């Protein structure tokens, strides 16, 4: 049971340390052991994501108030460098936890995307980052009726709210094309998508090659329609992915970029997505029925 913030920190560290020991041969790096271990640094990152400490200056400053938990806090430059070097380890931790979750075995999923802006619109011409070298471009955030510069994050989420897979693409990429690429890595799924994923040809190919049933509500001008009951059920279920997107945009501030480079952005995305999976994993360990209530873990009463 997690009764306070220090309990939460202990649980996160133990899970991270145990999982990292399982994948140690894959992430082993040369050189002497640092005072702040990899497990400690990753735990600090993931806990910081859950608490909303998204800027490194804020993160390190906040951890100084809890130095009895993590006594060997690196300097900001060293912390930043080691965090980038450990981003693949963080993603492997996410994958290991995901595979051990019973919820990840759900064969019914949702697919959607959300904008990942990297530079404010008016600052793009003077930006000194490497964004354009890594295909950052202008795109439209339809729901917000805004143009942004950056990428889109495409998510495959189970009906229980677990992020099964993801893909980062340029901001102007088609949801349908990116979704097809993402789903092509999976088999035997039933996937609900919005109208951006309507394509009889793509749906047929996914079914034939991957046994994936891609289901969408047809546009009003299409001949073949579905019942109002199906439309209502479809829209009700799809609200779940809005919940997950809301968690990522709210608690994890995934649409706010504090990175100055593409690899810095990737590091932060891995950190946020791993933290989300970890929170669901902890809730399952604790036997909580409402396992999507993840904010309460980092802010216990």
Regions found by a protein language model. Name each.
Residues 1-301:
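Short alpha-helical elements
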């Amino acid at each position: 049971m997690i009764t306070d913030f220090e309990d939460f920190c202990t649980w996160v560290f133990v899970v991270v340390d145990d999982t990292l020991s399982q994948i140690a041969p894959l992430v082993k790096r040369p050189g002497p052991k640092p005072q702040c271990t990899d497990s400690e640094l990753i735990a600090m990152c993931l806990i910081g994501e859950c608490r909303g400490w998204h800027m490194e200056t804020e993160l390190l400053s906040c951890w100084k108030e809890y130095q009895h938990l993590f006594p060997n806090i690196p300097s900001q430059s060293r912390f930043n460098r080691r965090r980038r070097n450990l981003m693949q380890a963080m993603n492997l931790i996410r994958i290991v936890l995901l595979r051990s979750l019973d919820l990840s075995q759900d064969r019914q999923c949702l697919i959607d995307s959300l904008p990942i802006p990297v530079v404010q619109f008016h600052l793009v011409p003077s930006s000194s980052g490497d964004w354009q070298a890594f295909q950052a471009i202008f795109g439209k955030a339809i729901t917000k009726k805004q143009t942004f510069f950056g990428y889109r994050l495409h998510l495959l989420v189970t009906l229980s709210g677990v992020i099964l897979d993801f893909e980062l693409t340029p901001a102007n990429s088609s949801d349908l094309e990116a979704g097809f690429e993402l789903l092509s890595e999976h088999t035997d799924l039933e996937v609900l998508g919005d109208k951006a994923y309507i394509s009889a040809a793509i749906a047929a190919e996914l079914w034939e090659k991957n046994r994936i049933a891609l289901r969408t509500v047809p546009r009003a001008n299409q001949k073949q329609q579905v019942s109002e009951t199906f439309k209502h059920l479809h829209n009700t279920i799809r609200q779940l992915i809005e919940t997950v997107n809301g968690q990522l945009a709210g608690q994890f501030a995934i649409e706010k970029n504090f990175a100055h480079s593409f690899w810095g952005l990737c590091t932060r995305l891995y950190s946020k997505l791993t933290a989300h999976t970890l929170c669901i994993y902890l809730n399952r360990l604790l036997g909580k029925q409402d396992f999507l209530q993840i904010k309460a873990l980092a802010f216990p009463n």
